[in-house]
From Swiss-Prot:
Known function: Together with LptE, is involved in the assembly of lipopolysaccharide (LPS) at the surface of the outer membrane.
Protein name: LPS-assembly protein LptD
Cellular component aspect of the GO annotation: cell outer membrane; transporter complex
Keyword match Membrane: yes
Gene: lptD
Region (Disordered): 1-26, 67-117
The species this protein was found in: Cupriavidus metallidurans (strain ATCC 43123 / DSM 2839 / NBRC 102507 / CH34) (Ralstonia metallidurans)
Family from the record: Belongs to the LptD family.
Keywords: Cell outer membrane, Membrane, Signal
């Protein structure tokens, strides 16, 4: 038996009036904007955009960036923009948002437009009056009035229609038993109208609508929904609506959002914009559950301070911890922009102390090409990310940046001066801070065939004591590194010789450098390299015959040689240098270290070979296979920590990788790092995906890394599975699990489902992940998305996109319509 749900369209089944004791929750402005169409002849100018104000922004404290200047702060992680992004002009006042963005029709009315009438029987009752019966119809200036009986007086421009009356204009249709209108003046009324908006799919009903003038109208006991008339799962109702298109504002009295007949949100009175402009008010609530904080409810309030400034306040109730207050202030102007965010939780019930976090970003244009910036973030204690942040990425942050600087770009030069400090949370050890760093870079490409670059840098490095009270080396470092190369590129082959010269000087603080080492250290090391490659192509008839598509196969050998003389750097500090991960990218570089404190000695030749299968007609790559190995003719003596005295000629691990997309819906990426001397696999990874169509996917991944040295002693043996798959026609399951075999423990997992009705989507997700305190954190996400209205609940979409590769959110499935539906 098919379930019959309440419809807001038929008078006999019109939703009841709002309960007298409605919850004081403000609905987004977009809830009522479609109603304007039926009253004031407005037209839809944009489609609905979901989720812009459905959730609060996180603090999003910025991770440290040691090699470049941070970019502008990102938009809120769990919602859309409340104001224009900071890189946009300050004159933009209508942000993308969760609105239908309705605006008056761009076509002005024509007071001299002729009127056309028709009917089964047409009778003139005066010189300019006419009466029609049976399929009566009046058309004027793009508007249509129909009814069983219709009278029209051309002198007064007044039309009176009774019996199955239909008013239509600009894609809006209203149906009722009676209407009286002064057509051109847009004054009159309609009784018991049911209305439909073609471009948005929204519809509703009212007891009466009064058109006061071209700009103002009033509805009594009005409803609105984007559901189909026979299954109105949700609808918005209001005791009274006052709409003023001249002021672009509407006021709702007794507004209630009903879901399956149950009032879930309401407000005694509130105003809303009619044209997408921002207005101050309460935003949809965000709620969820976390194992560290209990039930979590946030009700944001938005202040529209100015066209280029806004402030959002986030009162947050955590049942296990107390009441937290957050704020997010944004501003953008001519040559400057910024964002200030903060959170404060007084007297945390669990921790027994005040908890807080803040983040400040500011960007200021000084002169053309010169920008100053500040990027500062800090938290109150080491446990703050685990206890009070809202995402896995934030909960695992162990370092927060306090940085300020100036960048100047002039022709081929970029100059930078900055001070960079960090707040490092236990159990992580502190990082080196730059107090200050002065850097200049020059890049010139194709200067008479040469590519030229130059980098020079002076940095004062300081570091806090370690957790055990140990003082690491501190001092000043200055280096200069010119580079010149001459690429020779021809069809089918290329050769690129390159010369690099690195000169550096260290002035160490007394008593902090390696025991017995000088406080002044110098080095000057040249490097030469030669990179070369060729590309051969041929038809692949065997593969083409097998798959029924013409393929081209390539064969691409590559040789890379690098030579750097040995220079003992065992007494040099490690300020910003680490060992690069060995892989296909690193094996074709001049230095296996990242940073400027170690320059490896090289006498190495890398040999690589790649083959591809490419669809000849489309150019799509369906297969790639790569193999590479490096030959070290003398052995590398310079190590990250010290010098290897007995280095010998050797072969590197053999690298092999493949990417396969030959079969529709199947994707494979695999790689392996094999040590031929020990006959052992040092690293391997496999990623297999099956995606036959949209919102159908299964991912499998495996990663393995064997500890190979004292500095690389972290073992990885991890399996990951994730997917999204339809369970029924409207229900989709989502899941992920990651298990660490080496530690025999769960890394993270999530499970949930999405349900897509014709006018709403429901999402429920539970996530559990290992935190930095060697424990687990669990979170519950529950969200309902009302098509064309708003979202209520906690937003899991960003988390799902991050954890389930290829995930696509399900969307509501409205009943299909055609341009001729409701055509008049």
């Amino acid at each position: 038996m098919t379930e019959q749900r309440r419809s807001p369209h038929h008078p006999a089944t019109r939703p009841p009036a709002p309960p007298g004791t409605s919850r004081r929750v403000r609905l987004p402005a977009s809830a009522l904007r479609p109603l304007v169409l039926a009253m004031a002849g407005l037209t839809v100018s944009a489609h609905a955009q979901y989720g812009a104000t459905s959730a609060i922004p996180n603090i999003d404290l910025v991770e440290p960036v040691v090699t470049q200047t941070p970019e502008a702060p990102p938009p809120p992680a769990e919602g859309g923009d409340l104001v224009p992004r900071l890189t946009e002009p300050a004159t933009r006042t209508a942000p993308s948002g969760n609105t239908l963005n309705l605006s008056p029709s761009s076509t002005p009315s024509n007071p001299n437009a002729p009127a056309y009438v028709s009917g089964d029987r047409v009778t003139g009752y005066s010189e300019k009056g006419v009466e029609m019966e049976g399929h009566a119809e009046l058309r004027r200036d793009g508007g249509v009035i129909k009814g069983d009986r219709l009278t029209y007086d051309q002198d007064t421009d007044e039309a009176h229609a009774t019996g199955n009356v239909r008013l239509s204009k600009s894609g809006t249709l209203a149906v009722g038993p009676e209407a009286r209108m002064r057509v051109q003046a847009n004054e009159g009324y309609m009784l018991s109208p049911d209305y439909y908006f073609q471009q948005t799919g929204g519809s509703g009903s009212a007891e009466r609508v009064d058109f006061l003038d071209p700009d103002r109208s009033t509805l009594k006991k009005a409803t609105y929904t984007t559901c189909s008339p026979d299954n109105a799962d949700w609808y918005f109702s209001a005791r009274k609506l006052d709409l003023d298109s001249d002021r672009q504002v509407g006021t709702a009295y007794g507004g209630v959002l009903n879901f399956f007949g149950v009032p879930i949100a309401g407000a005694p009175a509130f105003s809303f914009p009619l044209n997408g402009e921002r207005r101050s008010g309460v935003l949809p609530p965000l709620f969820g559950y976390g194992s560290n904080s209990g039930a979590d409810l946030t009700v944001p309030y938005y202040f529209n301070l100015a066209p280029n400034r806004d402030l959002t306040i986030y009162p947050r109730i955590l049942t296990s911890r107390g009441v937290q207050l957050g704020e997010d202030f944004r501003y953008v102007g001519d040559g400057y922009s910024g964002r200030i965010r903060g959170e404060f939780l007084p007297d945390d019930k669990k921790a027994g102390r005040n908890r807080w976090a803040y983040s400040i970003q500011h960007y200021q244009s000084i002169i053309p090409g010169m920008t100053a910036y500040v990027n500062v973030s800090k938290v109150s204690d080491d446990k703050y990310p685990d206890d009070l942040t809202r995402s896995v990425s934030q909960s695992t942050l162990r370092q927060y940046t306090q940085e300020g600087g100036v960048i100047y770009a002039w022709q081929d030069w970029v100059f930078m001066a900055r001070v960079q400090k960090f707040q490092t949370l236990l159990p992580s050890e502190p990082s080196y801070e730059r107090e200050p760093q002065l850097n200049a870079k020059y890049n010139r490409y194709d200067f008479h065939g040469f590519d030229i670059s130059l980098e020079t840098d002076y940095t004062r490095f300081r570091i806090p004591l370690t957790s055990t009270g140990f003082q690491q080396p501190e001092g000043n470092r200055a280096f200069i590194q010119p580079t010149i190369s001459y690429p020779i590129i021809h069809p089918g082959w290329y050769v690129t010789p390159k010369f690099i010269f690195n000169a550096a000087q260290y002035n160490m603080d007394a008593g902090t450098n390696t025991t017995g080492a000088s406080n002044t250290l110098n080095r000057a090391i040249p490097t030469v390299s030669l990179d070369s490659g060729m590309t051969f192509e041929r038809d692949a008839p065997g593969v083409s015959k097998l798959f029924g598509v013409k393929y081209t196969q390539t064969l691409e050998p590559r040789l890379f040689y690098v030579y750097t003389p040995f220079y003992d750097q065992s007494q040099f500090p490690l300020f910003d240098t680490v060992q690069s991960d060995f892989g296909y990218g690193q094996i074709f570089t001049e230095n296996p270290f990242t940073g400027n404190d170690r320059i490896a000695d090289n006498n190495k030749l890398t040999l690589g070979l790649t083959t591809r299968l490419i669809e000849s007609e489309t150019g799509v790559e369906r297969f790639r296979g790569t193999i590479a190995q490096r030959v070290d003719f003398t052995g590398q003596r310079v190590q990250l920590n010290g010098t290897l005295p007995d280095a010998k000629p050797s072969y590197s691990d053999l690298l092999a990788a493949t990417t396969i997309q030959l079969f529709r819906g199947y994707y494979l990426d695999a790689g392996i790092q094999w040590n031929p001397d020990q006959d052992k696999v040092n690293y391997s990874n496999v990623a297999l995906a099956y995606r036959p169509e949209s919102r159908k996917l299964i991912n499998f991944g495996y990663r393995y890394r064997r500890p190979t040295s004292v500095t690389d002693n972290t073992a990885i043996d991890q399996i990951e599975m994730s997917g999204q798959w339809p369970i029924t026609q409207r229900t989709y399951g989502i899941g992920r699990v990651a298990f660490d075999k080496s530690a025999n423990q769960l890394v993270d997992a999530l499970a949930g489902f999405e349900y897509a009705a014709d006018c709403w989507v429901g999402r429920f997700v539970y996530q559990r992940f290992r935190n930095t305190s060697n424990g687990y954190t669990g979170r519950v996400f529950f969200q309902v998305e009302f098509r064309g209205l708003s979202k209520i609940g906690s937003n899991p979409l960003d988390m799902l996109r991050l954890n389930v590769p290829g995930y696509e959110p399900v969307t509501a499935r409205p009943v299909p319509t055609t341009p001729y539906d409701h055509y008049e």
